[in-house]
Amino acid sequence: MHEPAFWHRPSSLLSRLLMPVGALYGAVAARRLMRTGMRAGVPVICVGNYHVGGAGKTPTVIALAGILRSLGETPVVLSRGYGGRLHGPVHVDPHRHTAADVGDEPLMMAWTIPVIVSRQRAAGIAPARALGASVILMDDGFQNPALAKDISLIVIDRARGLGNGQVFPAGPLRAPLPPQLARTDALVIVGFGPAADDVAASIGARGGLVLPARLIPDDASVVALRGRRVYAFAGIGDPQRFFRSLRACGIDVAAERAFPDHHPFSQRDVADLQTAAERDGLTLVTTEKDLARLRNSEDLAAFAQAVVAFAVTLAFDDEAVLRSFLTDRIGRARR
């Protein structure tokens, strides 16, 4: 879905009109947060958002998996598989499954990390442990009470923040902010800007850990696009962040097109992009997540060959602090 513009305005008539609905939605969500979930038998680290849409969860999960491996752990990702048709539980095989089967994010992560997709998260525990999981990395699901979480990390974009701070549909929040803050162990603030400062201060005041991080473009991606004029397109939670990242690397973005998050590209979409790029002599560029969806469609795979993926990795400003935190909290979870 495309986020409505009024979600990111301090005050609007439409937001005020929707506040009663948001209050009902928020009351239900807040009660769900109070429930105690099933214990997995191994430590569970949840990577989530306070709001709908994306804010860098997938690169955060990938970065955490690398750190956990360096600590001697065997992480397995547990995902709901948003956008996929399979309910699971299923062990994602990137050579066999498609984005239509398991969702684009699990498919992309499965190239480097074992991923279990399970619509019912609790049902994914046994297959994750069968893969040797010493730690389960839960991709999203912070507001889902099915599983008990030993560590909850929330990701926020520092340029975007939490919009108008209202609960869906009056704003982007999935639940009222206070009960979400109370269940947050660490806050990952990504990028640059002041929009997440108030939340970071609240987490710090509660004794939570605040972890600044940044998305680092892959050198090969930058080199591949240097000196070219590009047509950038993306169907992610915040396409504008992707476009800003390209420009920040000195890439000449001559045209851009934003699609809804997890957008299922059609032949018409592809034809429009290709026609415009060829007409103006532009190189097509998109995110790794979007390219994963394109490559895994038989009808669109040929088009995908002509598209450059702009790859990024997430790096924490102080990884040593995070490593110490994970070691301590995982150790506590095992006692």
Swiss-Prot record:
Q: Name one Pfam family in it.
A: LpxK
Q: Look at the named UniProt entry and state the broad enzyme category this protein falls under.
A: transferase
| Disulfide cysteine pairs (residue numbers) | none
Q: Does the keyword Nuclease apply?
A: no
InterPro entries for the chain: LpxK, P-loop_NTPase
The organism's place on the tree of life at top rank: Bacteria
Q: Does the keyword Lipid biosynthesis apply?
A: yes
Report which reactions are catalysed by this protein.
Answer: a lipid A disaccharide + ATP = a lipid IVA + ADP + H(+)
EC number(s) recorded for this UniProt protein = 2.7.1.130
**Keywords in alphabetical order:** ATP-binding, Kinase, Lipid A biosynthesis, Lipid biosynthesis, Lipid metabolism, Nucleotide-binding, Transferase
Annotated GO MF terms = ATP binding; tetraacyldisaccharide 4'-kinase activity
Its annotated pathway reads: Glycolipid biosynthesis; lipid IV(A) biosynthesis; lipid IV(A) from (3R)-3-hydroxytetradecanoyl-[acyl-carrier-protein] and UDP-N-acetyl-alpha-D-glucosamine: step 6/6
Q: Where is the signal peptide?
A: none
Write out the residues that bind ATP: H51, V52, G53, G54, A55, G56, K57, T58
Cellular component per GO, a single term: plasma membrane
What biological processes does GO assign it? lipid A biosynthetic process; lipopolysaccharide core region biosynthetic process
Function recorded in the entry: Transfers the gamma-phosphate of ATP to the 4'-position of a tetraacyldisaccharide 1-phosphate intermediate (termed DS-1-P) to form tetraacyldisaccharide 1,4'-bis-phosphate (lipid IVA).
Q: Read off the HAMAP family from this record.
A: LpxK
Family named by the database record: Belongs to the LpxK family.
What is this protein identified as? Tetraacyldisaccharide 4'-kinase
Naturally occurring in which organism (per UniProt): Nitrobacter hamburgensis (strain DSM 10229 / NCIMB 13809 / X14)
